[in-house]
């Protein structure tokens, strides 16, 4: 995928990978900004129920407006590729920060409050995050 252009998104790097798919950094060549693209794996995209769930989750997440939750810009399909276009967040993944060494109590409390606040915002809209991890 690296170096490939899909629709008007030029893929520049891979950010992560999980059970549902792969996330890439890309340039939105129409708007001139960097975004994250979350691709549903081809095997899962062939399952109508999983594809519908992927799309439902993107629509639900798009209803959220919170500083600690990335903004969903859209759902796209190109040929057999299904993906979500999201805000690209700048910063360090929590898992990487944890690997660097112990966090002091003030940092732990600050992070915990931010995470709890984001989850409360989602829960207030009936959304339950089923895959919490420090990434």
Language-model features: locations:
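Conserved ATP-binding/catalytic core of the eukaryotic-like protein kinase fold
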Residues: 1-135
